[in-house]
């Protein structure tokens, strides 16, 4: 048992660079470096408390657990597997060389008890940890990890509502944390201005420093004046505004201000830790959360109700309005906003056709720490996918505009067939010495076959299977069987306790033949489960993709 439970430590963690190993092989060095990278001060939101992003999404349960995970990974043999239970290393077992080196289960609760109240009780007793999606699965790469998905969403919204041209238009949103911090840059890359409301000045400062947001307004009038000037000039400039969205959005409605798109990425999924009630300071919010959690949750949800009502008002004006996956509609509905779900989530509105083809947030990181390794892989992607101008444009913009946070990394939305092709090519680049050290390949849990989340990724499935969570379980089992380097199974990411189950996968390209065999299996099977899941739900795009790719789906393709 863990006898102490230290959640704060005044220390700076950074992943090692170069080719010298702390562990016994690259297959255990990789999770070690990526765990540390999750807590890099340039990556994590609150690394001294082990918080990576998303409210209280942690990399380890407490600092004692972190130390023991590090020590265990350093000494793990090539035929052993470490088991991690909600951020705590609980066992090392003999497996085999093609088995995962780490298996992770975070935040999972029996459904009847799967709520924030019970989870917070367990968390207070150091019996559980909220892993979010990539925080507790050690593959967070900073805000870049969601930039392309947000960019693709804005671009598709532009296609649907504005004939594919966002020049001279602007997005209204809130939240500049680990996920929401991607919004201003994504809007700029898509050609739009954006007004980004954030209640913590430190988060604004972080996004300004990393060039995810361009400038900060002094007040609402100044922000609107800047928006007016830049949209008239056709410039895509992102503006941060310090304040509370639950106050500012209703005021914009009152003034009759009309954005061109409205969404939100505050941490509304976690009312106790992630959404500031109207009229409160952040310090007051954190202090009262410890002393009167029920009252704090109530106050936060009441503010969310005001926020969502304003979003509904914008929708009534004819402004394209959508939820970006933080469960704010659910929170508002619980506070009496009966029609909170009148505006759609971003997946059914804009992203699902990509999921039907297994296309999702494929990402990789250079364990060397050398940016040149990423630039070389960028070039390889262009070489292997020569005709995708949209993808090439994304890679060019990413290199120009996205600052690396921690270990250099890249995200690139590709699907079934191409993921394995790229992974095998990266492995050959390591083998030949073109890359200076191995590459890790992973993805967000927000992917086509790895999540059940009725208020987000699986919202409004055409067969009504929104809440069926067999699919992420099958995904995790298959990736384990295929030989991924580490596999994770989480609950509550993105939308909070009781509303999602999801799985993650990471695989190492170390240049060996054995790695190539594992890569071919895992990077084919993983996106194929997404095609399978959507084909099973009856989506023609997915059924056709399954047939084209030769998937063996007994009830569909045989």
UniProtKB/Swiss-Prot annotation:
Classification via InterPro entries: Urocanase (IPR055351), Urocanase-like (IPR023637), Urocanase_C (IPR035401), Urocanase_central_sf (IPR038364), Urocanase_CS (IPR023636), Urocanase_N (IPR035400), Urocanase_Rossmann-like (IPR035085), Urocanase_sf (IPR036190)
Binding site residues for NAD(+): 54-55, 132, 178-180, 198, 244-245, 265-269, 275-276, 324, 494
Subcellular location: Cytoplasm
GO molecular function: urocanate hydratase activity
Cofactor: how and how many bound: Binds 1 NAD(+) per subunit.
Residues at the catalytic site: 412
Enzyme Commission code(s) on record: 4.2.1.49
Keywords: Cytoplasm, Histidine metabolism, Lyase, NAD
Cofactor: NAD(+)
GO CC, any one term: cytoplasm
GO biological process: L-histidine catabolic process to glutamate and formamide; L-histidine catabolic process to glutamate and formate
Pathway this chain belongs to: Amino-acid degradation; L-histidine degradation into L-glutamate; N-formimidoyl-L-glutamate from L-histidine: step 2/3
Catalytic activity: 4-imidazolone-5-propanoate = trans-urocanate + H2O
Domain of life the protein comes from: Bacteria
Family: Belongs to the urocanase family.
Classification via PANTHER family: UROCANATE HYDRATASE
Role noted for this protein: Catalyzes the conversion of urocanate to 4-imidazolone-5-propionate.
Name of the protein in question: Urocanate hydratase
The species this protein was found in: Acinetobacter baumannii (strain SDF)
């Amino acid at each position: 048992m863990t006898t102490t439970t230290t959640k704060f430590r005044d220390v700076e963690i950074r992943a090692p660079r170069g080719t010298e190993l702390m562990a016994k092989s690259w297959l255990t060095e990789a999770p070690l470096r990526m765990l540390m990278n999750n807590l890099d001060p340039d990556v994590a939101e609150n690394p001294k408390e082990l918080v990576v992003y998303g409210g209280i999404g942690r990399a380890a349960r407490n600092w004692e657990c972190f130390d023991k995970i590090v020590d265990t990974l350093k000494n793990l043999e090539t035929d052993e597997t470490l088991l991690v239970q909600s951020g705590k290393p609980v066992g090392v077992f003999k497996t085999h060389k093609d088995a995962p080196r780490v298996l992770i289960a975070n935040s999972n609760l029996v459904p009847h008890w799967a709520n924030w109240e019970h989870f917070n009780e367990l968390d207070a007793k150091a019996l559980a940890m909220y892993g979010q999606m990539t925080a507790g699965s050690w593959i967070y790469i900073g805000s870049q990890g969601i930039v392309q998905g947000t960019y693709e969403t804005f671009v598709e919204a532009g296609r649907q509502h504005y004939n594919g041209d966002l020049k001279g238009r602007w997005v209204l949103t809130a939240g500049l944390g680990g996920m929401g911090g991607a919004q201003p840059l994504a809007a700029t890359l898509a050609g739009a201005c954006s007004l980004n409301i954030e209640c913590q000045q430190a988060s604004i400062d972080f996004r300004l420093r990393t060039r995810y947001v361009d400038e900060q307004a002094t007040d609402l009038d100044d922000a609107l004046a800047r928006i007016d000037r830049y949209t008239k000039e056709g410039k895509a400039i992102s503006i941060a505004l310090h304040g509370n969205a639950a106050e500012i959005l209703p005021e914009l409605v009152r003034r009759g201000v009309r954005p061109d798109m409205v969404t939100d990425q505050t941490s509304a999924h976690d009312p106790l830790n992630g959404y500031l009630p109207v009229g409160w300071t952040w310090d007051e919010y954190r202090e009262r959360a410890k002393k009167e959690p029920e009252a704090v949750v109530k106050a936060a949800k009441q503010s969310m109700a005001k926020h969502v009502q304003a979003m509904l008002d914008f929708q009534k004006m004819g402004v394209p309005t959508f939820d970006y996956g933080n469960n704010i509609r659910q929170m508002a509905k619980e506070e009496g906003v009966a029609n909170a779900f009148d505006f759609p989530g971003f997946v059914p509105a804009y992203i699902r056709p990509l999921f039907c083809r297994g296309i999702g947030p494929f990402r990789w990181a250079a364990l060397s720490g050398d940016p040149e390794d990423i630039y070389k892989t960028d070039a390889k992607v262009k070489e292997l996918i020569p005709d995708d101008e949209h993808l090439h444009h994304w890679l060019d913009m990413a290199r120009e505009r996205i600052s690396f946070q921690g270990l250099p990394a890249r995200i690139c939305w590709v699907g079934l067939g191409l993921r394995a092709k790229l992974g095998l090519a990266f492995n050959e680049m390591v083998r030949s010495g073109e890359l200076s050290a191995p590459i890790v390949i992973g993805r967000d849990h927000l992917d086509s076959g790895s999540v059940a989340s009725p208020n987000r990724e699986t919202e409004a499935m055409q067969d009504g299977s929104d809440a069926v969570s067999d699919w992420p379980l099958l995904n995790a089992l298959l990736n384990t069987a295929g030989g991924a380097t580490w596999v994770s199974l989480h609950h509550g990411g993105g939308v909070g306790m009781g509303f999602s189950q999801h799985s993650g996968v990471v695989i190492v390209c170390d240049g060996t033949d054995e790695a190539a065999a594992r890569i071919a299996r895992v990077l084919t099977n993983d996106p194929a489960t997404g095609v399978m899941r959507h084909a099973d739900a009856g989506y023609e795009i997915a059924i056709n993709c399954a047939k084209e790719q030769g998937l063996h789906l007994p009830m569909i393709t045989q």
